[in-house]
Amino acid sequence: MKVVAFNGSPRKDGNTATLLHVALSELESQGIETELVHLKGPISGCIACFKCHEKLDGKCALDKDIINECIEKMAGADGIILGSPTYFSDLTPELKALIDRSGFVGKANGDMFKRKVGAAVVAVRRAGAIHVFDSINHFFLINQMVIPGSSYWNIGMGLAEKDVERDPEGMQTMRVLGQNMGWLMKKLKE
């Protein structure tokens, strides 16, 4: 089994990446292969050209960024984690582009993410995290994915790099998320 996580932060080693590493470590301790992908830009948003509905090749017609590589990784994984910091009470444009473009491609190609396990991870300084968490979970639910819970919402608090490490509840929430995601993936394979 494999989980691929996407870091939607422009900071490769910031708080979002820190939270993702904690969840991925728990999955690895259960023998699950993991991969962390940094959504490096520039990344274009969906232009609603609907070429993915015409070609039906599992790819977005926009091919000058990493989104098609990400879609391929998502299709090949058993679990997907989408992580984002909270910017003005919303997710980053890089993650939004991945959600929109992979969502269109997935729907056009036979619901290619159906029954995969999906988890949202959100870094926040103060407010807006629930909106980001909800937006990511809507993507999972629209794509008929299964969402594991944790001991609280999958949120870590901090501003400066590595600040989330001083949020014990946030770190514990990520550990429990990784444990529950691994358990759920194994149950779905039985």
Question: Can you describe what each PLM-predicted range is?
Answer:
Residues 1-108, 158-190:
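N-terminal beta1-alpha1-beta2 submodule of the flavodoxin-like/Rossmannoid cofactor-binding fold
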Residues 93-94, 108-152, 172:
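Short, glycine-/small-residue-rich phosphate/pyrophosphate-handling segment
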Residues 154-156:
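Short, solvent-exposed aromatic-acidic interface loops
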